A protein has these predicted regions:
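Active-site-adjacent loops and short helices of periplasmic peptidoglycan-processing enzymes
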Residues: 2-117, 121-125
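Domain-terminus/edge residues, biased toward the C-terminal soluble/receptor-binding domains
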Residues: 93-94, 107-110, 114-327
Length: 327
């Protein structure tokens, strides 16, 4: 259901889908609402807006709403699953496969808690305005030909008053109860994913415990601010002998408090760098290590243009380098 929402959000963001666009409910989608699964309770032939279907998926956990979205976007659930898998590949979800839009039991539906965390992070980061839906505690569906139905959000941690604002519950016969949850305290956000809980109560209790443990035991450190000078690299035969470089994104790292002393940042580049240099050129990389294990790599980008020296200055510079080894 998280991935189904992501596909819809991506299309809305690109302008290829509108919230007020309506999809006609098929008999196949309606039958899901009568089969005992969590549902939005759509009716055959109903014309339902994308906005309401998304609320039905996110808040009411409607499997029928998932299928309606899938058919409306891709023509069939099979086609939609292909789109889901393409997105999973794009996100680096290497141990995931989607066979349908809802997560209903199918041997070809599988994932890992890590992949689900990556997917959740993508949704939160890239669609913050729509992520707001995940903290809504109820949804009223004024359905055609029937009384309005109000359903509560199935995420139990939304009601625990600890700051959780999403994201999604799950259930499979094989893995029982699962939950992807997220909490924000100040500028820190943590995502926790758990699976294999035997009861709803243990899912809620253990997921809450995991989030609180994360808040208590981990610290988020800012490595670099987007487009702000990070360091200088040596330049060869340039009008300046140093070039400012930056990282083109904000870089934060959450680490266990006891590992802070093991955090190392190493700069890699083949230098001195030959001028001319253009602003935006990738000149090297920054590697982040914890306990000598590389955990992240980021490009070092030139913050400025460096012109090449004239011929006389280059000759003198070469002589100076041969004598003193200094650029």
């Amino acid at each position: 259901k998280i991935m189904t929402s992501i596909i819809a959000f991506d299309l809305i963001k690109s302008g290829d889908l509108k919230l007020d666009e309506k999809f006609i409910i098929s008999e196949k989608a309606w039958r899901l609402s009568t089969a005992g699964y969590s549902s939005m309770f759509v009716m055959v032939g109903d014309e339902v807006s994308v906005e309401n279907l998304l609320k039905g998926i996110i808040i009411a956990s409607g499997n029928d709403a998932c299928l309606a979205i899938a058919e409306g976007i891709a023509g069939s659930e099979e086609n939609f699953a292909e789109i889901m898998n393409e997105k999973a590949s794009e996100l680096g979800m290497t141990n995931t496969n989607f066979a349908n839009s809802s997560g209903i039991n199918d041997p070809d539906n599988y994932s890992t808690v890590r992949d689900i965390a990556m997917m959740s992070q993508y949704l939160i980061k890239n669609h913050p305005e729509y992520y707001e839906l995940f903290k809504e505690t109820k949804f009223t569906w004024d359905r055609t030909g029937g009384d309005p139905i109000t359903q509560g959000n199935r995420n139990p941690l939304l009601y625990k008053n600890i700051g959780v604002d999403g994201i999604k519950t799950g259930y499979l016969n094989s893995e029982k109860y699962s939950l992807a949850s997220s909490i924000k305290r100040g500028n820190r956000r943590l995502i926790a994913v758990g699976s294999g809980f035997k009861t709803k109560n243990s899912r809620s209790k253990q997921s809450r415990k995991l989030l609180i443990w994360g808040l208590s035991n981990f610290k988020t450190i800012r490595i670099s601010e987007k487009n702000k000078p990070f360091t200088e690299l040596s330049v060869w035969q340039g009008k300046k002998n140093k070039v400012l470089v930056h990282l083109n994104r904000d870089v934060y790292k959450s680490i266990h408090k006891k590992d802070k002393k093991h955090l190392k940042i190493k700069i890699n580049y083949e230098g001195p760098i030959q001028a001319p240099i253009q602003k935006g050129d990738i000149l090297g990389s920054v590697n982040i290590y914890i306990k000598d294990e590389k955990v992240n790599t980021f490009d070092l980008v030139s913050s400025e243009n460096i012109k090449k020296q004239n011929i006389i200055a280059r000759i003198l510079g070469s002589i100076n380098f041969l004598i003193w080894g200094d650029v």
